[in-house]
Amino acid sequence: MAAIAGRETYDVVVIGNGALGSGLAYQLRKQDPRLSIAVVGPSHRTGAATMAAGAMINVWAEMAQGQFEDPALAERAGLTIKAMGLWDQHCAELSEFAAQPLSIKWGTYIVNNALGSPHEMKAVDYIVQAMRERQVAHEVMGPDAVPWIKPEQKGRVIRIVRVPDGRIDARQVLGAYDRFFAARNVDAFNEEAVKLEVGLKIPLLGAEKRVTLAGGAVLKTKNVVLASGTFSQSLIDQVPELRREVPRLLWGAGSGLDVSIPSWIRKYGGLDRSIFDIDAVVRTVDRGGACGVHLVPYDNGDFYLGASSGVWFEPEPKPRVHALHVLIRGLVEEINSAFFLANVGTRGPGFRPVSMDTFPLLGQAHMPGIWFANGTKRDGFTCSTYICREIAKEILGGESSLPKRFTPSRKLISYKTRDAAIDDFVAADVGGEVQHGLYLPPYAVEPHRAAKRAKVERIYEMRGIGNFGIHPELPHIYENDEFYAACQHARELE
């Protein structure tokens, strides 16, 4: 329960204790020591995206083709770039409350290999060109440049690119936030929020909000922050005006594997001792809507292998077989074959919050005092340093530098244009199938791609969509009548 017994009214109630919710409470307290703050969320954080992540500080390895040529995608990339520069200082400050000093280990290897699709080569070409144009330090390396990248022959390396992305164990960061709350008078409620009530609007000031917890306690406040990812949707649905104006949140499910090396291998060497030399993230680019195969070392002989990704209308409580199958194959076939003898345990699923247009929901909604730190998809942990600082400024009456485009109450933002979105869907879908073992003879490649294009074009026609682009991970939501009816929202460009 709360650190202050009997308190019912707060200046700010933050619903959600993952990277964004906890990070925002941290920034609020840092910027105003007198503020009364409550953070609501189960301490186990089951289902939180951060708990199922490695985690990587993903910036350049996540850039997609055309990222900087599309205004909305460029602004989303800007969030990660700005956040990246804040992490070292953030870790230095937060280390006071950590079980051990926090620091980012910088450096990530992106691999192109024989198992990837042609789209992956183009994706890495784009990343390299984008870094060159912006004078971002990187290195294009030969296939044998990193001695511990030793895949099976079928996954032979074609090219390696070292980018400045980083890694840190996200669980350590969350643990430091928890200790900070206890030390700095932030009330943490180890419960779920089950009810949200909003009174009549008072212009500029907002009305009193009431947040009911699972145990029956009621918290009153002028400012509620919805930062519990897609779990927030059940609260949004209770406020019709909010539900009508804010794009629906979907469940971006993802799971990973905790990989460890048995003691006998540590003693005798196993298949290849080079696995003990892994000292940086190694990954492919995004594949089939997922964040590729990526291995995050923890510097103690343990690793995180991730990550699956699928956008669902309803959550599923356990990982899917095909998702874990692809990860295990990728670990051995594409990173180091010596992992054949490793031990694994599942982590997740965690649910990345995916808005109906896949763009983030940031800042104050059209209803005063209702705030969002949500919809960040796979970027929430990486972006949290910047997003939380800026939202805290605005809650406290200052100016935020977050893009106005991502205001929560809005029309759906187009993913590029219709034609470009369809092209990206076909490339991503085929890339996902290649990841699952698809091989087509040359004469069948174009007919296969044409069939996919025709299928997604029928979805556009069925929903009467003109030049608006559907994100490549969402056509199945538009295709299903039940899902579409629940998620339908006004679109820009139409």
Language-model-derived ranges and their functions:
Residues 10-38:
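N-terminal Rossmann-like FAD-binding beta1-loop-alpha1 element of flavoenzymes
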Residues 13-15, 218-231, 388:
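Short hydrophobic core segments
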Residues 23-30, 42-43, 51, 55-61, ...:
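Active-site substrate-recognition segment that forms the wall
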Residues 56-146:
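Dinucleotide-binding Rossmann-like beta1-alpha1 core, especially the glycine-rich loop
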Residues 98-115, 134, 140-184, 308-312, ...:
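Helix-loop-beta segment of a Rossmann-like dinucleotide-binding subdomain
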Residues 160-215, 219, 227:
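Helical element adjacent to the flavin cofactor pocket in flavoenzyme catalytic cores
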Residues 394-494:
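Helix-rich C-terminal "cap"/substrate-channel and partner-interaction subdomain
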